Amino acid sequence: MKLSRKSDYALRAVRHLSTLPKDQLGSINTISEAERVPREFLAKILKDLTRGGVLKSFQGVTGGYKLAKPAKDVSFLNIIEIIDGPLRVSLATDGKAKGFYNDSKNEGAFEKFWKDQEKVIKNSLSRQHFGRFALRGRRNSN
């Protein structure tokens, strides 16, 4: 499994926004510079995250972005799946390759193995949330 560059940038952008004081907006320029993400690419990512319900956008000269919900309620899995779609670790788990790994000897054991591994990874990513960065960032700014 390899995380896409787009997901990596999205995770970094959300991490950045989670460290800001609750009433402060993050501008595209500020996030782009702080996280070293190309501005044009970041704009598309932030739009996707806004459509996905993770961010709120505010127009105008003083506009920007902020989290739409508490950082503790935004998981890494949520961000990855908004950006890249459902997380899949193998052809065996996407529902399109039914029986792809099956043979008469293993009776789907290989397919079951990959499905179990996918559950482990998804559970781990769903337990990782941005609240941990929010606390750290706000502590460092005081």
Where are these predicted regions, by residue range?
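Short amphipathic alpha-helical interface segments
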Residues: 10-22
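Short, hydrophobic-biased segments on the C-terminal half of alpha helices
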Residues: 14, 46-47
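A short alpha-helical element within helix-turn-helix/winged-helix DNA-binding domains
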Residues: 26-36
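Alpha-helical residues within the helix-turn-helix
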Residues: 33, 50-51
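Key DNA-contact positions within bacterial/archaeal DNA-binding proteins
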Residues: 40
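Beta-hairpin "wing" of winged helix-turn-helix
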Residues: 53-62, 66-68
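Non-DNA-binding regulatory cores of transcription-related proteins
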Residues: 68-142
